[in-house]
Swiss-Prot record:
Organism: Arabidopsis thaliana (Mouse-ear cress)
Domains (record comment): The protein kinase domain is predicted to be catalytically inactive.
Name of the protein: Putative inactive G-type lectin S-receptor-like serine/threonine-protein kinase SRK
Cytoplasmic compartment segments: 463-546
Gene3D superfamilies noted in UniProt: Bulb-type lectin domain, Phosphorylase Kinase, domain 1
Length: 546
């Protein structure tokens, strides 16, 4: 018995100490990270849920007026920064409200026990669930047993408000039918849904759009394997590792920070600008390291179809080669919001492609995507499709792969100084006039030389034929080996060295038939040779008539 007295004494001492400790430090008594089915949070109790590492805190809050909200904010940051609001569009109108678990759902009740917000889970109801705030800022509902499945029954990360935290996914979950996007606050003092959204569009290639009233304000460009084609600076974020996933189950973007002790977030502000922040502990303030849209060229379709935006030119809008302003007067006066039209209509079979380098490629919502083929096959595919107006690679890694072809009008492209993507635009062959002139000169020269050779050959053949005919016509008339023309004068036959037939000479001497001469000279017998002269051999002959 004596040995038990000190133990009882220490137990009493511990409980007395714990009682006074909780009385003196009431905040510590409510710093829990879970909410069980038997517990609740009320506005009046000032109770909150704090993540295990003390990074985030969840509780009721108000900014101005009598509207109360349930939200999550950074616990250790001096500037109160909200990252999630549960009942943003259904605030409590007075300081009487409660958060609890009911039928395996998280619910917020007002002073009349009316549900103003709920997780709305349906299906089989678990006997015991618990809500927990994690150190990454995710508020989850899960089974109360630790050995149960790691899959959450519900999580706040699936229902973002205006902020994307590290490890939080933005995009579509096909398996559960979720589309996760951020929506701005209505004002700096009103967390209800504002007019601007930043969400994923999966038609064509997946890419993010900034919307207002369902009108596009800006666009990230599609994922090109390394970054979004309209956010080249992503590769300069050394402290942030980002990932884009596209498969049958989900299409989503997420990021994480390399320094787990630092705080980073992406937030869409009240005027629709998406901003990236990191917390600077020494200055005790948020540092904005990135934002979008950052200039005029980031505004969606600012230059209209068939035109590109370039911040280094004046005006910033430029019609693509082969196109011209629909209203040159408006463009000359500085109004470049009009359209560009083709100078020469396409002919399908003879069209060619003009290469635009370092571009943010057009919106792909109406494009055809084939990731199985390369750039050469993509060009052939575009050529055979007469309505194809441009093509490009879908992935720029390892020299490029995949194919995007645009049908009809395309818009929202811009030119970068470097690191952009190649875009091949279809133009009529006539738009390549300068190149065709050089080519035409070469072809013309080849044809000219060929014609000259053929003509020279024809002339040569004609000349050879004429020479042959001339020789045949001018050949001396003789008998066997003695082919020559004979001239007979007073019974004397002389062989002329040369006399063309057909030449008319004014001869007074009588002409004698050749047969007669042969007979008269006894077949040119040597016995009848009189001698040789300048005109050849001279024969004597005797005619029949004496």
């Amino acid at each position: 018995m004596r040995g038990e007295l000190p133990n009882k004494h220490h137990s009493y001492t511990f409980f007395v100490f714990l009682f006074f400790f909780l009385i003196l430090f009431p905040d510590l008594s409510i710093s829990v990270n879970t909410l069980s089915a038997t517990e609740s949070l009320t506005i009046s109790s000032n109770k909150t849920i704090v993540s295990p590492g003390g990074v985030f805190e969840l509780g009721f809050f108000r900014i101005l007026g009598d509207s109360w909200y349930l939200g999550i904010w950074y616990k250790k940051i001096s500037q109160r920064t909200y990252v999630w609001v549960a009942n943003r569009d259904t605030p409590l109108s007075n300081p009487i409200g409660i958060l609890k678990i009911s039928n395996a759902n998280l619910v917020i009740l007002d002073n009349s026990d009316t549900h103003v917000w709920s997780t709305n889970l349906t299906g089989a109801v678990r006997s015991s669930v618990v809500a927990e705030l994690l150190d990454n800022g995710n508020f989850v509902l899960r089974g109360s047993k630790i050995n149960e499945s790691d899959e959450f029954l519900w999580q706040s990360f699936d229902f973002p408000t205006d902020t994307l935290l590290p490890q939080m996914k933005l995009g579509r979950d096909h398996k559960r039918g979720l589309n996760r996007f951020v929506t701005s606050w209505k004002s700096s003092f009103d967390p209800s849904s504002g007019s601007f959204m930043f969400k994923l569009e999966t038609l064509g290639l997946p890419e993010f759009f900034g919307f207002t009233s369902f009108l596009e304000v800006y666009r990230s460009g599609p994922w090109d394997g390394l970054r979004f084609s309209g956010i080249l600076e992503m590769q300069q974020w050394d402290d942030i590792i980002y990932n884009f996933t596209e498969n049958r189950e989900e299409v989503a973007y997420t990021f994480r920070v390399t320094d787990h002790n630092s705080y980073s977030r992406l937030t869409i502000n009240t005027v629709g600008r998406l901003e990236g922040f990191t917390w600077e502990p020494t200055q005790q303030e948020w540092n904005m390291f990135w934002f979008m849209p950052k200039d005029t060229c980031d505004l969606y379709g600012i230059c209209g179809p068939y035109a590109y935006c370039d911040m280094s030119t004046s005006p910033t809008c430029n019609c693509i080669k082969g196109f011209q302003p629909l209203s040159p007067q408006d463009w000359a006066s500085g109004d470049v919001t009009g359209r560009c039209r083709r100078k020469t209509q396409l002919t399908c079979g003879e069209d060619r492609f003009f290469r635009l380098m370092n571009m943010k490629i057009p919106a792909t919502t109406a494009a055809i995507v084939d990731k199985r083929i390369g750039l050469k096959e993509c060009e052939e595919k575009c050529k055979t499709h007469c309505n194809c107006t441009a093509y490009a690679n879908s992935d720029i890694r390892n020299g490029g792969s995949g194919c995007i072809i645009w049908i009809g009008e395309f818009r929202d492209i811009r030119n970068y100084a470097a690191d952009g993507q190649d875009l091949f635009v279809r133009l009529a062959a006539a738009e390549f006039g300068e190149r065709r002139t050089i080519r035409g000169k070469i072809i013309g020269l080849i044809i000219g030389i060929s014609l000259m050779l053929v003509l020279s050959f024809i002339i040569y053949c004609f000349w050879k034929k004429k020479q042959k005919r001339a020789r045949a016509t001018a050949a001396p008339i003789g008998y066997r080996d003695r082919i020559q023309e004979l001239i007979i004068t007073n019974g004397v036959v002389m062989s002329s060295g040369r006399r063309l037939l057909g030449e008319e000479e004014d001869l007074e001497l009588p002409l004698t038939e050749f047969e007669t001469v042969v007979m008269a000279t006894e077949n040119f017998s040597d016995s009848n040779i009189l001698g040789r002269g300048g005109f050849g051999i001279v024969y004597k002959g005797r005619l029949l008539d004496g």
